[in-house]
């Protein structure tokens, strides 16, 4: 059993965030519960709930997600999870110019407020080891948060991060990192990058994909060179669409067992 507590944040970027704090019943066996901060909670939290994974009994979860139609959520994600332009402001998404992008600094503040609300609701969480997890665009946001290191995050988990987004922007941001932290990269063995978005490709689908695993290995090497405890977890047989479920469960395992 568990407790699911709704938390209210002021809207950011012109849209609200649906925030839930999930607490397992009972007291932790040893020390404070680890806290896993889930992005895209509209998809990731149900995946964990339905899994019945035993790690749910030893980990608190802070879920930040969206409500609405999928097309609407896609636009929200493009705004919230992407780095700002050279002037620090908003700009357009490179693959879908109709999408506004560059709202990651505002999303950083949303995560900060959500963590403060969660710790106010459950004071013991003030002593928790906090992990931040995101997939795809949300994985890009996790790396942006790592580059800023302005959140009280101890452990960063990025699944299939959108490293291609305005390449080499995120690589540049990751060149000057601060204190060493744990970073876990999760990637599907069969993933590929396509120059067209799924929406732009239309019913015929996308072709001529470029394998992304070598890029994930490059990311691991760059982070390790800066003293990060960077690990790469390859999910066998998984393409981009299948990574979300596998990676989210793996993220729970890593967050709940991280020292």
Q: Model-derived features: where do they sit?
A:
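Gly/Ala-rich beta-loop-alpha elbow adjacent to hydrolase catalytic centers
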Residues: 134-138, 142
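Conserved hydrolase catalytic core segment
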Residues: 144-155
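A domain-start/cap signature at the N-terminus of enzymes
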Residues: 1-34
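Catalytic active-site module of serine/aspartate enzymes centered on a nucleophile-bearing elbow/loop
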Residues: 247-259
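Serine-hydrolase catalytic machinery in alpha/beta-hydrolase-like enzymes
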Residues: 17, 30-121
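The feature captures the conserved acid-bearing segment of alpha/beta-hydrolase catalytic domains
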Residues: 158-240, 255
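Short beta-strand immediately N-terminal to the catalytic nucleophile in serine-hydrolase-like folds
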Residues: 132-134, 159
């Amino acid at each position: 059993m568990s407790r699911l507590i709704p938390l209210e944040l002021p809207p950011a970027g012109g849209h609200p965030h649906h925030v839930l704090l999930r607490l397992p019943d009972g007291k932790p066996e040893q020390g404070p519960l680890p806290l896993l901060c889930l992005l895209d909670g509209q998809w990731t939290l149900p995946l964990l709930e339905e899994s019945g994974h035993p790690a749910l009994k030893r980990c608190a979860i802070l879920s930040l997600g969206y409500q609405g139609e999928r097309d609407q959520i896609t636009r929200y994600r493009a705004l919230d999870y992407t780095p700002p332009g050279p002037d620090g402001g908003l700009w357009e998404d490179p693959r879908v110019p109709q999408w506004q992008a560059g709202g990651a600094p505002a999303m950083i503040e949303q995560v900060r407020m959500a963590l403060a609300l969660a710790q106010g609701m459950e004071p013991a969480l003030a002593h928790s080891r906090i992990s931040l997890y995101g997939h795809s665009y949300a994985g890009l946001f996790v790396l942006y948060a790592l580059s800023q290191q302005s959140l009280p995050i101890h452990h960063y988990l990025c699944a299939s991060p959108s490293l291609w987004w305005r390449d080499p922007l995120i690589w540049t941001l990751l060149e000057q990192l601060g204190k060493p932290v744990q970073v876990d990269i999760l990637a599907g063995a069969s993933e590929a990058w396509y120059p067209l978005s799924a929406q732009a490709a239309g019913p015929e689908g996308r072709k001529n994909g470029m394998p992304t695993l070598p890029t994930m290995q490059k990311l691991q090497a760059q982070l390790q060179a800066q003293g990060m405890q960077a690990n790469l977890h390859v999910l066998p047989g998984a393409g981009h669409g299948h990574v979300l479920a596998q990676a989210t469960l793996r993220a729970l395992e890593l967050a709940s067992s991280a020292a």
